[in-house]
Structure formats: C-alpha cells, structure tokens
Amino acid sequence: MFKKNTKHLQPALISAASELPEKQLKLLKGSWAQSFYHEFFCRIDEEIFEILYSSEPSRPNVPVNVLMGLEVLKAGFGWSDEELYENYCFNLQVRYALGLDRLGDGDFTIRTLYYFRERLSKYYLESGVNLLEQAFEQVTDAQIRDLQVRTGMQRMDSTQIASNIVDASRLQLLVEAIQRVHRILSESDQERLSSSFEPYLKGTAGHYTYRVKGKEAVQEHLAQVGSVIYHLLAELKDAYAAEAAYQVLARIFAEHFKLVEDSVYPKENRELASGSLQSVDDLEASYRTKGNAQYKGYVANVTETCDPDNDLQLITKVQVAPNNVDDSQLLAEALPNLQERTDLDTLITDGGFGGEASDTALDGQDVKLIQTAIRGPKPDSHSFHLADFEVLFDPQDTPTNITCPYGQMVPITPGRTTGLQARFDPEICAACPFHLEGRCQAQPQKRDRRYLLAFTPKQIRAAQRRKDFLEHQDHGQNLRAAVESTVRSVKHPFRAGKLSVRGQFRVTCLMIASAIHVNVRRICRFLTDQNFFSTFFAFFKSVFQPQALVWA
C-alpha cells in the first residue's frame, strides 16, 4: 500500500545531528547533505510512484523518496549496492540527506531496494514510462523555477557508455549462447542431444575460444558452430520456442549466418549489422565505430542550460539509446519534451546533431540550432555555397524567394521532376563579377537563357545550419565547449565509462541518477557562493558605513 513520507518534515527533538558539537553541526549543514535534502529530497513528488503499489489496505511501502535518494547516491558516488547499504546504515551525512534523524530509523533490508527497481522495470516494460525520469524532470523543473535559471539557451552532447558486459569475440558469443540453451533443457533432452553439445561444454566459452588459433581456424569453427545451432533450433523449437535462451540463439543464428540450400555459411564481419547482439546478458547493447575506436554498449545524450547570464547551469534532459542511434535522432526525440518543459529557443550542439531527423523535427519550430561544426567535406572557399544566398520563407516555413550574393532576388519554384529551382536574369548574371570569376553555381541552360540554380529543401536546411554556424563563429564565444565537462561529471563515478548494470532501462536509470547528483552539487556550490558574498557584503557594510557617517 502506498503511503507518502512526511515524517521527515517534523524533525525529532533529540537526534544524531542535534547531539553533534556546534562546530560539527555547522559543517554538516554546510555540506552537500543539506543541499541534497532541501533541493532534491524534499522536492520529490512521491505520488508519481503510487501506481507501483497496491491500492488495497496492506503493509505500507518503504518511503519512495528514500529509495530514490539511495539510487541517486549510489550513482553519484559510484558505490556498489553493499557500499550503498553500509553508508545508509552508518553514514550520518547520508542519513541526514535522506531526512532520517536517528540511526535506528527507517530500517529495511537491501532486498527492498531490489524490489523497487524490479517494480520500476516492470512498469516501464508494460507502459513505456520511466518513472525515475518523470521524477527527475519534475524535480529539475522545480529547481529551475525556484532558482530562476534561464532555459532559453541550451547545449547538448552525447557520449559512449558501456554496460557491464564481457567484450566477447564472435565465436565466444556463439558458444556462450549454446551453453545457455543447454542449461534450460530437461535431463532427457540433454542426454538426447549430448553429441551436439559435448564440444562446447568443456569449460567456459572463453576457454573454448582460447584454444582456437588463427583466422582460418576461427572461420572453420564458426561454420561448425553455425551447423550445430541450425540443428539445435530445429530439434528444440516445439518444446522451447518460448524460452528466452532459445530466442537469443535464434536471433544470433539469423544475425551471424546465412542459409543457402540447407547449407549454413557464416557471414563476413562486414556483413554484421551494428545492432547485432553483443552479449547474451544485454540484448539491447549495440556496436559502433567512432573515429579509430570501437564501442559496445549505449550512447548517452545530455542537455543542459547555457545562458551566459545564468550563475547556475542545470542538466535538463538525459537520454540513453543503443550506440548505433544517430545524434540527430536523439535531438529529434528530446525536442518536444524540452519545448514543453522549458523556454528553449536556441540549441547549441556539435556537428553530429545535424541531419534529416533533426531537420524534420525543427521544421516549423521556434528553436534555432547552432552547430559548432558541420558534417561533410569543407566547401570550396572560392565558390559560393547555398549558405551565401539569402532565402525567404512564408509563414508556413516554405521557401518563396532567394537573393544571390550580387543582390538579385527571384522566386523559388518547384523543379521539373523533384526539388526546387530558381532562375536568374541572364543580363544581370552576365555582368555579375562573381559569375565572371567563376564563383557562382547558377549556370545558363541550352533552351532557357536564364541562369538556373537547383537545390532541395534538405540542402536549404543544411545551408541555414552553415549560416548559423558561421554567425556563431563570428561572436568568438563557444558556449558548447563546457557541456563536455558536464558529460564528464555525469560519467565520472563509473570507471572508464563502464556502468555496473546491464540493459537499456537500468543504464538509463543510473545515468539519470548521476545527472541528478551533478545538479545537486552545482546547486550546493551556487548557494555556498551566494552565502559567502552576502556575508562578505554585510561585513563590508558594517565596517565602512559608520566611518562614512563620522566623515559626513
């Protein structure tokens, strides 16, 4: 049964904190724990989580704000569950941050936290709603409102993160899948298919692959394993098709092998899709090559405020997706939520966020995308780019007119087959110095003497992005750069960017919890600085104001 936690709003007269000497109590109230309690813990709307609990009269739940606070502390400090529970039981700062006055209050076993995670995960699978993300947005919106953080300008950046999976070779992954299927079989089926399984049960999958030396040997074993998997799938389909291990084996076979006239052939490495299975323990992790590095896991996308007039910047959005998802798709998915919750009008990103998905999402929106770099080859500096032309739009955001660098304005019309076109006066173009220098893309046609410039709506959007990029460069202020340190702050508790959990949902929860902790620490520093300056100016006023009266 759900019950809100209001006990912490009435502190006990005698508590662990109140028994501290005055000096230590002052340190406690000036630490992160005070900010965590007031700026996060007290802001949590527990009713968001009411749907996880029974409506029938029954035993009340462990306070949701305590459980959520523990998730944030685990992510923020990079603790294991054991370390988290020890700190919950004995660390005065942690208990103070969670509104617990006495060391014996709020006792529960660590399994309660596991059940809470299970409820969150089950609800997400059923509804597609991440309640932890909802709570993060609710708390952050309240912080933004109360601390008067401007949200018109925001910046966004993505980073690669890994879940807690083994970096397995292709052969090792296949053998591990076979071993997992063997474990779910009945004794009779294990005995019936013992000849098929026997070569792959002598030790771990890693032991099996260690004995295979050379590329040719690996290819031979891949072919043998493929034939075995094909045979097992046929033999076990009727009895085990609903089992998760069988479904994983079927997926691996489809991704790694091709069937030609009942003969099994392993696919070449280059034929494998980036979304192919990377681990039997994490079915959503994907593969990506970025630069000279290879990654297995997920991509996290972080958005934060960046108005130069803000004394405090806060993270407003955290997304996690398989790492083969393009940055422009992440921007497109985040945009409606950011517009609904904030006053977003300018979004600053790197070059990776420009693309068809983001262009489509930004069409007709009052949000300006500024990229600090542009995808693709650098254009010829001698020739004019479409960004050098001025395009006018109607209220429906449809391009209507275009003005060339020489100042000639003409209407934009549909092309004969696809795209758009503009036709310029041949007499003006013939006398244009830019045309004489060979810098203009518009050229005369055989049947029509007018100079033709053909382009597509996609090219217009790309040109507008380039124009915004060049204007941003002229300002000499790179507002995007600092978001990289924010990403680093969110990833810092996780060694080498590898999280202690598996699966997209759990990875998302841990990244959101870490972002909450980053926000709390920023608020703590902000409030500390404010208190310092207010104390300093009060002291300055008390010292010099009497002197001014004497001199007067």
For each predicted feature, which ranges?
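Double-stranded DNA-binding cores of transcription factors and transposases
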Residues: 64-65
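Basic, low-complexity segments
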Residues: 1-56
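DNA-recognition alpha helix
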Residues: 84-97, 139-140
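Anion-binding and metal-coordination hotspots
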Residues: 83, 102, 106, 114-552
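A short glycine/serine-rich beta->alpha loop
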Residues: 52-60, 320, 501-503
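Short amphipathic helix-turn modules centered on a small-residue break
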Residues: 48-54, 96-103
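Alpha-helical support elements that line or immediately flank enzyme active sites
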Residues: 68-78
